[in-house]
């Protein structure tokens, strides 16, 4: 099966697709606008694309941030085509100007967006704690989670939950955003 991905793309996404026997179809990505919607539209016409993986907010390695209008167009295009959008919003909390950018999922009215995120880029990569809102793909997500690992370590999850409940995550993010803002000025 073919999965549309940003180009350039985070190597880990490409490796993950390869490990499970999927082919990556690279779609050009602009530094300012993110994934080329025109390129994706052409790919959907020419290839049997089964899914699309995108980092809409601060993509890696480009750092592109897709506008809300383009996110709406992306979600709509993929819903019409019947192709699920796998949104990796791992960098969404690390915005450093204005308000937190909306995820593409905010524009999803059909359950076609599978929203994924983690604390691996904000708190610590070693925690290996993430989450997914699979929309209408809940049954498939449960099955894949079950087969990929039967038991997730509860101690890191409990530590992250405590950090969130006590307000530590918000305090840390304010500090991190200030550092990113200063580094980019």
Briefly describe each language-model feature range.
Residues 2, 23, 50, 82-84, ...:
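Proline-centered loop/turn at the N-terminus of a beta-strand
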């Amino acid at each position: 099966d073919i999965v549309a991905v940003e180009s350039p793309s985070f190597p880990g996404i490409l490796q993950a697709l390869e490990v499970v026997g999927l082919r990556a179809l690279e779609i050009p990505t602009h530094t300012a606008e993110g994934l080329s919607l025109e390129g994706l539209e052409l790919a959907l016409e020419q290839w049997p694309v089964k899914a699309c993986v995108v980092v809409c907010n601060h993509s890696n390695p480009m750092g592109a941030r897709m506008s809300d209008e383009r996110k709406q167009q992306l979600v709509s295009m993929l819903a019409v085509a019947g192709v699920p959008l796998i949104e990796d919003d791992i960098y969404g909390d690390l915005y450093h100007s204005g308000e937190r950018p909306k995820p593409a999922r905010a524009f999803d009215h059909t359950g076609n967006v599978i929203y994924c995120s983690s604390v691996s880029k904000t708190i610590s990569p070693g925690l290996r704690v993430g989450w997914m809102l699979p929309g209408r793909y809940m049954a498939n997500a449960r099955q894949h989670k079950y087969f990929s690992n039967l038991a997730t370590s509860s101690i890191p999850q409990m530590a992250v939950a405590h950090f969130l409940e006590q307000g530590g995550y918000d305090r840390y993010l304010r500090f991190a955003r200030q550092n990113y803002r200063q580094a980019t000025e």
